[in-house]
Structure formats: C-alpha cells, structure tokens
C-alpha cells in the first residue's frame, strides 16, 4: 500500500513538474516573441506580450523596459515612464540595462515637456557612465528644449565628434529645425558633405543631405550615382525629389521601379499614391495605399495611414475620413496635424466628440 501511495505521489509530482516546465517554456517563448514584435514595429502586440511577461514574473526589469519602449512608440509617454520607473525599481537591474532605461526615460520626459526631469536623467547618465554619441545627442536635445543653446551646441558637437556620420548630421539638423534654428543645423549637413563618397551608400546618404537642404539638382545627381550602383533605396528618394520638383511623371517611374525591386515595396506604393493624388486619381491612390499597408511598418505605415485620410477627404467622403482619422489617432495620439484635421472633419459630418 505504501508503495502504491508513493507511486501516486510521484506521478502527481511529475505531472506538476511537467506543467510548471510547460508554463515556463511558454512564458519564455512569449517574452522572446515580444522582443521580436517590438523590433518589427508591432507595438500593440509587443505591449500585450510584455504585460503578460510582467504578470508571469518573467525577466521583470527587461519586461517593464520592453513595455515602456512599446508605449513610447505608441505615443503613450506617461505610461512609458511608469513602466521605466517600475523597471528601475526591480531587484536585479544590470548596469547596462539601467543605462538603457534611463536613456529611454529621459527621452519620454522630453516628449511630455518635463524638461527638468529629463535633464536630471541626462546628468545621472553623464555622472555614472561613459558618454557616447547617443547620450550627447539626447542631452543636446533636452538642453535645446530648455533654450540652453550653448549647452545644446556643445553636446551636439560632442555627438558629431563621436559619430561623424550622415545620419548623425541629419539628426542634429532635424533637432535645430524643430526650433526654427535651421542655420545652426545646416553646418552639420555641410560638414557631412565635406567627405568624399566612396560607395553607393555614401552617394545615397549625400543625396539625402542635399534633399534636406532642398538642393534638388545635387540630390538627384548623387542619387542617380547610387542607383547606378544598385542602391534600391535611392529610387524612392529620387522619386520624392522629382515630386518636389513637380515632375510627377519621372517620380512615378522611380516609385514603380522601387516597388518591383525592393524587398518591401510599401514606400514605393506610398509614392505612387502621392502621384495619383497629384493627378486627382483618388481611387488609384487608395488602391496603392492598400497595397502599401499590407507590408508597411513603422514610419511608413504612419505615412500611408495619414495619406489615406487625405485621400478620403479629397474624395469628399468626410464620414470615412473621420473614421480613419479616429483610428489613426488611436495609434499615433501625439500627431497634432491629424488632431486638427479630426476637429475639421467633425464639423463636416456634424459629429460631437463626447470624449472632449
């Protein structure tokens, strides 16, 4: 009898162990999938998965951090900060992870205009870690928002000194442009152009810089050189150059080539939709937008969804435009342009927003 009871207990123990092991494996898969979805731009799904990981107690600090990043991408900055605070309060937060979380929290504080809190995090990072180009740039952004122009300039110079790339020059230029200080940012673009192009990527990057400077002739020259060396991304940007020059015929050709050659044609479909809108062919524009949405992610998805609103408005289908604007703001709640557009559309369809 004792032997039978022992056998039964062992069976229960084994079953419990297998169940726990199965749950543990499932939780681990969920956590890994969350990281993949975050990387792929599936932010709402990633957020749900990270919240599941938090509830299961799986890598708490990392899960809170992941949820915070997903919230940031969705424009929910205060919720992001809450997650970052929770992550920092966890028992086991490695030095490298803490640096990462503080950087994200500072960026989130910047978004909600909590400049003092953002600068406090930047100062903590400067005191506790070796500064790199990203931290210098972030500190410069915060200082610029606080109208501390000398401090901002010093940090931007350090950032570019650490990372004298075309991307960094464009990033600094964009920060100054937002403050209507374009001249201060242009010198970084000029510094980037002082380098000699060595390959197709360099020609593409130089084309980008010239495009931001609205020097379309030089932009086109550089992009054509990149295209001659099989740089596919240059096709889409050259299409935008032609659009800005009001040459929609050549623009359409570039976007069509991009769709046929790129691994993900979303950017090309978006460009074709712009050409259709220019021609007044709104049904074709919607068709191209629909094709683009099927494969788009990140910023390109946002641009496609924005253009979809515009097309319905151009078609005078204000009811659908209103619906699309409301759906858009659920994904990108910080977009002030669409918020204004939503208010206009409500007047067109006589809808009162009960949430306001």
Placement of each model-derived feature along the sequence:
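Start-of-helix register in tetratricopeptide repeats
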Residues: 28-29, 62, 96-100, 134, ...
